[in-house]
Amino acid sequence: LNAYRTGRIVRRFLEIETYRMMALLALPMARETVSKLSVFDRRLDLLIAHMQSAVKVDKALLSEVTKLSSDVLNFSALARHRFGATKAYAEIVASRTSELREVRVEQRQRIGTFIDRRFQPAVRSVEAAERRLDELAERVSLAGDLLRTTVQVQLEDQNASLLTSMEERARIQV
């Protein structure tokens, strides 16, 4: 190896380590996301159970679904930035690792394989937290849509009964 090639390899190693550490910054956020998802899930389950048991939808239920939706979207906005950065940094790490063009030496493990085996589980954890957050946001959105549909049907029923009573009054007056 000449000095130029050695310098490039050292630079690649430094870049790999820097971007790997930057990607791992999302791991605490992913752990926090998983714990918050449990809380959000319980709140959503309670709201859905209340929706199923309620004969009429009240303003408190509508307010709770709106609050939960707001909380999930707010937390999602905070987490997405970090999760997106992790994805980008992980791609850079993979790119830099492939640029090393390692060759296997006897029974020794390549450094790229070593890094990958220790780095990818963390990246997959972040991706799983992001996926679960997306699924929860979708479920909250569906619950909100269902609640809005229920309110709309109730309003239509009220309007129909009002029209019926108005017709009866008009018939009585004639």
What do these predicted regions represent?
Residues L1-S63:
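Extended alpha-helical interaction modules
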Residues E64-L68:
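Amphipathic alpha-helical surface "interface" segments used
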Residues S69-V174:
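Membrane-associated alpha-helical segments
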